[in-house]
Amino acid sequence: MLMTQMTVEQFAHDLGMLPGLLLEQLQAAGVDKRSAADFVTEQDKTRLLDYLRKSHGSSGPRTRITLARKQTTEIKQSDSTGRPRTIEVKVKKTRVLTRQNEPEVIEKSVSEEPAPLKMVETPEPTIVKSVVDAEQMALRAEEARKRSELIARQAAELKEKQEKRRQQAAAQANVKKEPAPAEQESGPATAVTPGSVTEISSKLPETGAAATPATSTAPATTSTTAATKGHAPQKPVVKPEEKGEKKKKPTKQDAWKDEPVKRREPKARGDLSGGQEWRMRKDKHGKYKSDELQSQHAFSVPTEPVIHEVLIPETISVGALAQKMAVKAAEVIKVLMKMGSMVTINQMLDQETAMVVVEEMGHIAKIAASDNPESFLEEVDVSSDEARMEPRAPVVTVMGHVDHGKTSLLDYIRRTRVAGGEAGGITQHIGAYHVETSRGVITFLDTPGHEAFTAMRARGAKITDIVILVVAADDGVMPQTIEAIHHAKAANIPIVVAVNKMDKPEANFDRIKQELVNHGVVPEDWGGDAMFIGVSAKTGLGIDELLEAVLLQAEVLELKAVREAPAKGVVIESRLDKGRGPVATVLVQSGTLRRGDAVLTGAVFGKIRAMLNERGKSISEASTSIPVEIQGLSEVAVAGEVFIALDDERKAREIALFRQGKFRDVRLDKLQVAKMEDVFGQHEDVSTLNLIIKADVQGSCEALVYALKKLETDEVKINVVHSGVGAIIESDINLALASKAVVIGFNCRADLGARKLITSTGVDVRYYNIIYEAVDEVKKALSGMMMPDRKEKILGMVDIREIYRISKVGVVAGCYVLEGLIKRDALVRLLRDGLVIHSGSLDSLKRFKEDVREVKSGFECGLSLKNFNDIQQGDQIEVYEIVETARVL
């Protein structure tokens, strides 16, 4: 029978150390023992052992000893085919050995090897026989000698530590929180280590099991203590494993239950441990490494806020913005709600709003350039390299009133300056050509109308260098002339005035000068900067002087451009050719455009398959200020858009697709705003005219859409469902049928399939060749859709003189028509003392008991009001009607 309690002195004797030193360590472990006669319980021993393990960096103790066994059996069973099969079954049994109040049998774990002693060197643990032999006796003698040396060293160390203890008594009031100085100064002469306690357990010769390792539990310590006191220990009930059998690990359930280091809980965001216990590595003995070593390499969540640099494109969704800031989309939506915007996770934000949100959330907002493929264009742009620039030909636009001879002047210049044998050999629809003179080359642009010119200037493309303003000498300054002056002044373009029709006898050159001075165009001989040239497109008078003036103005401007570089320019016109596909007329502003180059204009890309000059001949390259017609684009380009030539077609495709996505986002954003406007405008009486517009060229289509959009008012709107270039096809008719739209064809016709569909469906299709006719027709249609003006017209005044109450009829008033007349279907107001008592209509109107349609002034009549009987003698009735008047735009 083992003792369950012993005194401190007995426990120190069993451990082979001085009682005073043991008292010191017990007090450091939080066990309140004052003298060597105090009893030590099993809980006190466990607390002392835990304290010693923690002080030496060992992992936490196991509170139980687990013994795992594996039993192998064989069973015979038939498989699916009926053949017998032998199946090997391995059964693992786990027994947990716990301490009892009066244990009769001490069970020991045999699953672990002994840990090396820290202070006393011990031989390699071996499985010894139950009979004590000579080798065991020699080992005991050696251990007794080493223990006596250890006791001597501990006695000297105790005196030194007690002296320091007295000096630090005030600072060491709380022993549990601050360990004793003896533990802080532990060195080669440390008092008692877990290894020394384990050393005692190795003195049991009768157990036949390996010594308990450094992490042995308190029950094992108790058994070793009893053995040192001379008690004859009993053999464990559990049979020790054979020598060749592998050691068993604790089961998963007991491991989770017994090892505190594995008891993990979900980590909150504020937990700085970073969940390091989840990723702790095991050593070669299957134990977790110490927390101190693991914490050196553990990841910890940053406590300081992380500031991101967010690149924001033109439009970005709420979810994408949250992803760039590494936050949840709900936080971004919350910030936007505080700013007064109700958004969803997929809603698009403009660049300015997104930057405000990023700054509000504490991050750095920057305009996106690194993830924009268009930044590649800035790298390859060498058009501004002044060192490589060479003089170029001027680009001249001829403007003026329609009837002032602008076309005749261009025809004369073209006819006389084109090489011999090619008279009239100019493709007129290109709208651009160049002529050669003795002093240089001049490129003319035939822009039919100021609308296209305004659109080009609005896009920021500097197409025109000089404007020739044509004014008829016999007509003077007209409204379109004034508009052309305003456009040239706004674009800061020099003007050369060509006073045409000087061959007529009624031409007045000075009057033209005076009228233009009133509009800000001052001639040079009057102190201004505009050159005035008198010309005649019929006789050729002054044509050479006009070209000289244009070239002189070009020299003053010092026009230069880079020739040996990728081409860059502007799309003048584009159309869809039935045989050649999308065709674009472009003006090269810098560089050299070659056949086979990859080109990019807006969201359209392609590779030049063919290139024609203004004479319709195929050419291989075009230099600066030369207009050419190119084929090979993916779709019809937008007139006025800038184009650039690239070496890599793949890069052109990437940029075009990026722009298409960007344009789509912007279009959807605008469409969403339009939908919100529609929601707020649903209660208003707004009529909408749906139109599908098809034209021969892109410029005409844009001009027609622009002109029709100007006809909109607050009451009538124009919705252009679709606009495009080319003939009217079946898909256009189907779209018009679905959207209830009117199809307008400008200089184009419907193909055979579309004509059959028009006949069967009855879709309204209108064809026009002149833009003003189309505008007038649409204006009339909009006028018919507008609500007419409603005006009130007073017909007469009636005085009520008698009141008659008739059963089944109601109140009938005998009246006298004072002025005007009273009609049966007219509206009336009942007036009493100048106040309106009732407004309504007549129920009946009689004269001499006969129904009449009207009663004129000076006659009597009887009448009754519909749904109103409160009529009194002396009241007056005002008779009126509503007159509707059609409105005109």
From Swiss-Prot:
Chief localization: cytoplasm
Amino acids binding GTP: 400-407, 446-450, 500-503
Region (G1): 400-407
Gene3D superfamilies for the chain: P-loop containing nucleotide triphosphate hydrolases, Putative DNA-binding domain, N-terminal subdomain of bacterial translation initiation factor IF2, Translation factors, Translation initiation factor IF- 2, domain 3
Subcellular localization, as worded in the UniProt entry: Cytoplasm
The keyword Ligase belongs to this UniProt entry's keyword annotation: no
Stretches assigned to the tr-type G domain: 391-560
Keyword Nucleotide-binding assigned: yes
Residue numbers spanned by region G4: 500-503
UniProtKB keywords: Cytoplasm, GTP-binding, Initiation factor, Nucleotide-binding, Protein biosynthesis
Stretch list, region Disordered: 158-296
Region (G5): 536-538
GO CC, alphabetical: cytosol
One MF term in the entry's GO annotations: GTPase activity
Region (G2): 425-429
Compositionally skewed regions (Low complexity) per UniProt: 209-228
Compositionally biased residues, Basic and acidic residues: 238-270
Region (G3): 446-449
Function of the protein: One of the essential components for the initiation of protein synthesis. Protects formylmethionyl-tRNA from spontaneous hydrolysis and promotes its binding to the 30S ribosomal subunits. Also involved in the hydrolysis of GTP during the formation of the 70S ribosomal complex.
Family statement drawn from the similarity comment of this UniProt entry: Belongs to the TRAFAC class translation factor GTPase superfamily. Classic translation factor GTPase family. IF-2 subfamily.
Protein name: Translation initiation factor IF-2
Species per Swiss-Prot/TrEMBL record: Nitrosomonas europaea (strain ATCC 19718 / CIP 103999 / KCTC 2705 / NBRC 14298)
